[in-house]
Amino acid sequence: DLDFYRFLNENGGLPDIITCCRFSLHDAAPLKDSLMNLATTNEAGAVYNAYLDSFKNEDGSVSWLPVCADAHGFVVNRGLFEKYGIPLPTDYASFVSACRAFEKHGIRGFDADYTYDYTCMETLQGLSVSELSSAEGRKWRTAYSDPANTEKVGLDDTVWPAAFENLERFIRDTGLNAADLTLNYDDIMDRMRGGELAMYFGSSMGVKRLADEGIDAAFLPFFGQDGQKWLMTTPYFQVALSRNLEQDSTRRAKAMQVLHVMLSEDAQNRIVYEGQDLLSYSQNVSLRLTDYLEDVRPVVEQNHMYIRIASNDFFSISKDVVSRMIAGEYTAEQAYQAFNAQLLADDTDTAETVLTSDKGYSNVFHADGGNASFSVMANTLRGVYDSDVLIAAANSFTGSVLAADYTEKQAASMIMPNGLLAYRRTMTGAELTETVRAFVEGSEDGFTPFNRGSLPAVSGIAIEVKEENGGFALTGVTRDGKPLPGDETVTVTCLATAKQMAPLLADDSRPFKGGDAKVRDTWSAYAAGGSAALAEPEHYITLR
């Protein structure tokens, strides 16, 4: 979330290397002067110009670069088409014909999970990529994203009216209605499996998931009403470097090495899901298409991979306006006017401070003591969960605790948005030692620490760890400065993702409770409660 990095930057806590998933130059504008210009780097030079243009500032500088793409289009049940003798769509007209043909058999031709903001937003843009990629469209996008613009930029009167007309026609041609606004991803997949739905809007990963279940599926592009074909894409993440690196040539060289690796072919192959196609924006990365995406190879080879406009405003306003169009409340003209008005509206909401930290704590790991900011969070959360001991995987927290006032959203951002869960159990000292060992030494099916910074943070106990042969070994656990008695009983809360906890949860003889509430939600509720306070850090680890 770019708001998170803006908050860090305003309080002197911007990291050297930052990544972001939901991204737009519009939202990144406040960070521009704090980021390195990457325009002259080899990594930027390798990005196809058609895509690099989406990341260029008005002055030609480039602060962010994209890694590989997640492609979105139409996932189709090809077996259903063959069963009813309906040709696969090759353009917009045949897409509409297919929808009508399926309707005669009592099958929905197209639907999607319109309960989500991104589905609303990407449908609006995907149907009009040709218009948005035209000279007029690029001109508007540059103005909307320009960091130098001090005034709000609304929709233009050329490209966007046509986009809403295209969406209005699509809603009519596919029969979308108010009932579709309640559908989530699982609802759509269930209908695909049951033969009740022929096509939905989603990522190429959906083709593999259906194929793994024995369903003959295919992936098709967006069909523009002008005859062109496009894929909607979103980078798995964007990466930027802090301008502070320019003051330290050694750190800058290391950061550039990290950037080089992030954008390498090997790294991008590791980013995509197993079996998913690798679609890169870089000329240095080979195109790798599985059978699932062979139908869209010509689209990819034409560089018809549109990078969505993904500002916070576009997510929220698209959800509101597109939903109202689907529900029949807005015409194309009314939707255009409503969207434009919301883009131009003044920001009147002032978020309330829910948490104040008078001190700042670094997230640098020290062999004698650990990570001060992680200790603050672990100690505070131990109180929140009313537990004797808390063990937190290293990827539980986002970074330094800043000396700043936190709003509810900023406080929530102190917890990693990775589905972190809380698990609780009463156990003996001996069992606690083995639980800590699992976090420190790792396991094949869970998570294994790979450097000092990835060791867990603990609260209510202190641990001794030995670093050897590229790994770590637990050598001691103390509580209140004394060795932990094996028969002492304590309540223990573990913070970890479901995958990290899987090996511990596999032992039915020592069941954990919980795993059904996200730590981020619990922390947000605590911060918003009116009496939130941060605990002091402690020396929780000695690494030898």
Regions found by a protein language model. Give the residues of each.
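Long, aromatic- and glycine/proline-rich binding clefts that accommodate carbohydrate-like moieties
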Residues: 217-220, 270-324
